[in-house]
């Protein structure tokens, strides 16, 4: 059976992972300015296998609201264009024969509100993940207390620590989401 400290540390690590996962997810939500991470989810059909775009092309930002995609192998240019259309990012690729330009449009107020809803939905998923970690940790603590691994005082102390970690984890998630919402609304 794990010690109370191990249970607490395990819960801390899992809660931190929820924060990292939320940051990665929110990075894909565009805020009206060019960012190569917008294309993280784009997979290009390359020699019969779906391949991340950044492995078949260089992605640069020549202007604040423009991405330039230059394939390492020009034969894959049309596949990149198809993949961008299929990705539902709402971006229209401009193929000049050797590279693709993506102009990032200014976000409309309605689109901003839609994206804020998406941020809130992702935040809620992350909060559920943190709460699930809390529940698992509490279950482990209860088992340990029942088995006599630690006394009632230690159990209550660990219970409080798990709750404090949960509160801190959720606060961290809310801070991440609030920063993204602010970025979207200022755009």
From Swiss-Prot:
Belongs to the RRF family. InterPro entries: Ribosome_recyc_fac, Ribosome_recyc_fac_dom, RRF_sf. This is Ribosome-recycling factor. The gene is frr. Its main location: cytoplasm. PANTHER family: MITOCHONDRIAL RIBOSOME RECYCLING FACTOR PSEUDO 1 (PTHR20982:SF3), RIBOSOME RECYCLING FACTOR (PTHR20982). NCBIfam families: frr. GO terms for molecular function: ribosomal large subunit binding.
């Amino acid at each position: 059976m794990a010690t109370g400290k191990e249970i607490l540390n395990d819960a801390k690590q899992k809660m931190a992972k929820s924060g990292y996962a939320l940051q990665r997810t929110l990075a894909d939500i565009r805020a009206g300015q060019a960012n190569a991470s917008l294309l993280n989810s784009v997979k290009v059909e390359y020699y019969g296998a779906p391949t991340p775009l950044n492995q078949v092309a260089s992605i640069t930002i020549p202007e604040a609201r423009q991405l330039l995609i230059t394939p390492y192998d020009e034969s894959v240019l049309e596949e990149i264009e198809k993949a961008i259309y299929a990705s539902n990012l709402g971006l229209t690729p401009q193929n000049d024969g050797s590279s693709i330009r993506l102009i990032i449009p200014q976000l409309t107020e309605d689109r901003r509100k839609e994206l804020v809803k998406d941020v809130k939905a992702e935040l809620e998923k992350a909060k559920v993940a943190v709460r699930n970690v809390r529940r698992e940790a509490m279950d482990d603590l209860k088992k340990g207390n029942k088995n006599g691994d630690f006394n009632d005082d230690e159990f209550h102390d660990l219970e409080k620590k798990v709750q404090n970690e949960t509160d801190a984890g959720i606060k961290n998630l809310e801070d991440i989401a609030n920063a993204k919402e602010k970025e979207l609304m200022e755009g």
